[in-house]
Amino acid sequence: MNSGITVEEMFTIDVNCDYLGVSRLMLMENAGAEVARAICSRFDVKDKRIVIVAHTGNKGGDGFVAARHLALLGAEVIVVLIGDPSKIRTFEAKRNWDVICEMEYSINRIIVKDSLRMDLLAKALDKADIVVDALLGTGVRGTLRPPISEAVKLINKAKDRGAFIVSIDIPTGISPNTGEVLGLAVKADLTVTHHKPKIGLLSNKASKYVGELLTVNIGVPVEAELFAGPGDVLITMKERKLTAHKGDFGRILIIGGSKDYSGAPALAGLAALRSGADLAIIVAPKVISNAIRSYSPNLIVREYDGEYLNDKGVELALNEAERADAIIIGPGLSFRDEVVNSVLNLIDKLRSTNKKLVIDADAIKACSKDKNVLRDIIGVITPHAGEFKILTGIKLPNEEKN
């Protein structure tokens, strides 16, 4: 089974896909088609009554796509929209809603704007063979409330009567990051999750609601995860409220500098502050600590004895890392045996903390001595052409050096 991902990681991937030319509309089409394919691989859907219970978000959009594909295969398809069509939240979901609105012959649409007409859903579910949960997905927040909670109860009653329940991506009512039940949740027979399972699906708390877990490919390029893109930036941006205080917007730790280089870690710290971080803490040898401080009073310097990164520096860095949101390792460290051993030791110990790392400059060269240390890190590696060759043994063509 694929390892799980968080909601935030999936958001990053979606944004990066769009940047690479794989639009959200394409991803939605693939997701809905895969749901239909999963159903058709288990049932002969011709003349089966399939009720798709959708809400106004992107999970609803996936359901609209699935409805279209299932109708083309001869199923009796009913789409029940819980909510007002005018409040469908995204362009992609609205586009697919508009499509099924034109399919009046093959798809029956029912609109339940509020709890007062929940009888319409109950009637639609009464003789359903298959029910598709397209209500709430990764955007769920807090305990379910009416009319969604009432819809979930009716879906579970349909299951008790023998209907087969399929949840798209994650059963409605399950927290995608923790697996906790948010008051109540759909009890699915099959959950068709996109790209990779959301980590909540893999928890014991969610196991009796997930049913069979099927992970499907929706066309996410490898590059959307392998390389940093706009999504990796957007996910870090927070609304800056008037009530915010120091530390709310990031504490960045820079481990760099040596007797030879004092400017590189200072510039990294200034760049962190310029990018919006609240605090930039630099762990550096004592011999250059005052030089770094001279760049700006906003830089916090933690110093250790020695001229290059050593065991004392690693110990200090690990202590500072406990409170850091992200850690930059490398600028100005120099490339010496003592530094290489210290860098490898530091990264190895940070791997188990799940801290976000940036491996830069001389730290990249150090990692070339033992590339296994980079396995399973959460981070970004920032080589220029020369460092890329040292790390991988691959020489980039001249036109790609920049």
Region locations from a protein language model:
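YjeF_N-associated NAD(P)HX repair module
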Residues: 2-5, 125-262
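Phosphate/ribose-phosphate-bearing ligand recognition and processing surfaces
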Residues: 61, 86, 140, 144
